[in-house]
Amino acid sequence: MTTTHGSTYEFRSARPGDAEAIEGLDGSFTTSTVFEVDVTGDGFALREVPADPPLVKVFPDDGGSDGEDGAEGEDADSRTFVAVGADGDLAGFAAVSYSAWNQRLTIEDIEVAPGHRGKGIGRVLMRHAADFARERGAGHLWLEVTNVNAPAIHAYRRMGFAFCGLDSALYQGTASEGEHALYMSMPCP
């Protein structure tokens, strides 16, 4: 058990019985700012701008697995870590995978339930991911985040992540069309 901001949580590897709660976790967010992306022939620039009215983002059900097997089907280079509240309910999770060829641990997904945000759960889940990265010999951690998720971008930067790339076409043809994928990385601590 770990106490963060006065609340007690159990942090552990996911179990098969956690799969339904992981799939059903509310990953939506509301933000009053977004990162505007200016793409030029020579690169790109980011600028945080107000979102008025505040943007509410609900991620659509992707209709299947995209490599994030949750608590089921994990291999030696994949893990899902969970945070469980004192009430036994899932408070958050982080699904990660290691790629040996580039010594990268990818944060496939990290979500914290709305009622548990701001309590350090994401930071502790990321520490578990970093521990797993070190076990695997990873040189860095890497993730993708939409430019409209300013709360997550700020959290990742506080954790030590820095911008390392952009994909302006990743979300074309999806419910997130018009958004840009921002890539962030940090050396394995």
Swiss-Prot record:
MF GO annotations: acyltransferase activity, transferring groups other than amino-acyl groups
Chain ranges of the N-acetyltransferase domain: 44-189
Reaction equations catalysed: streptothricin F + acetyl-CoA = N(beta)-acetylstreptothricin F + CoA + H(+)
Region forming the signal peptide: none
Composition skew (Acidic residues), residue ranges: 63-75
Enzyme Commission number, as recorded: 2.3.-.-
Enzyme class, UniProt record, top EC level: transferase
Influence of temperature on activity: Stable at 35 degrees Celsius. Rapid inactivation occurs at 50 degrees Celsius.
Region (Disordered) residue spans: 55-76
Top-level division of the source organism's lineage: Bacteria
Sorted UniProt keywords: Acyltransferase, Antibiotic resistance, Transferase
Field pH dependence: Optimum pH is 7.8.
UniProt-listed GO biological process terms: response to antibiotic
NCBIfam families per record: stat
Physiological role: Involved in resistance to streptothricin, a broad-spectrum antibiotic produced by streptomycetes. Detoxifies streptothricin via acetylation of the beta amino group of the first beta-lysyl moiety of streptothricin.
Family: Belongs to the acetyltransferase family. GNAT subfamily.
Name recorded for this polypeptide: Streptothricin acetyltransferase
Species name: Streptomyces lavendulae
Gene assigned in the entry: sta
